[in-house]
Amino acid sequence: MSTTPKHAKLLDSGATQGTSADAAQNTAAGSAQGTAPSVAANASQKISAGTSPFSRTQAEGYHKRRKRVFRKQMVVRSLLGVFAAVFVAAVVGVGIWYANVQAQLNNSQVITNELRQTLQEPSAPSDPYYVLLLGTDGRPGETEYRADSIILARVDPIHKRVTMLSIPRDTRVLWKGSYMKINAVHYYDGANGMVQAVNELCGVHIAHYAEVNFDGLAGITDALGGVTVNVEQYMRDTENFSDVVELYPGVQKLNGAQALFFTRVRYAFADSDYTRMRHQRTFIKAMIAQILNTGDPVAIANIVNSTASMVITDLSVSDIISLGTQMIGMNTDKDIYTAYVPSEGTEIDG
């Protein structure tokens, strides 16, 4: 029996492993040598066929796709730029419009800081509040003029109700130690004096103020395209009016000049000022109904825009539009109440 030394086995094993590795290398080399020509041939065929990822055709296609994407991006960016410019212009335009209208409404000669301090807002935004409405005989540029018509309005936006109380312009009041007609208070102390005088007379706290002169009333009426009212009786006055001297009874649309005649004429009636005050309330009621019947906040905004130069008030543009919008749907036949302060005429000092 013979034996093989251990180191001989290791050598044999190493020899065997070495042989296997050599064989594997030879096989791999042979395979590589055998496939190299095929790979080269295939690559050559692809290039010649124009399908290589680096071919001119594909490069041109890629370039065209990039140009299309770039053009789309440029179009989108251009549109966004246009929209942004339009938006900015619109915002600026609205801002200028708002400031212009606001400046016309809040005439600083009338709406003074003293007046704003006298006006008193309601305790809660939902509470009813009082507005003093004046029709004046003032002319553009004048600062001293009288109140020709005086109406205290109670506005209840939540319940969509308005109450208008006419105060006779000849009502006697004690003002700063002297007795005078209430309409003369405006001549001496302007809007602020009138608000204080009416507060004391009626025991209220007025929240807002608005006035319009004769020309303004006619202008507002024309801006609305006329106002439809029911003229209850024939009226004629040729001594105090020239443009319009008479109106016949019946439902009719009054233009500016006719509206001025309807709301100012008094010598044609036996009770003089009382009928005139009733006509004034009737006209304002009809005007409110006509404005609210549009049912459109945009239309209300347009009306504010077209009449701002004819009205003076402490209210802002947004306040007026908001109030008008709140009152849309109001039943103007039932929910606008009108009355006048009971009084009797007395001749004083001759």
Segments the model singles out, each with a brief description of its role:
Residues 2-14, 36, 40-42, 46-350:
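Non-catalytic, solvent-exposed segments at the cell envelope interface
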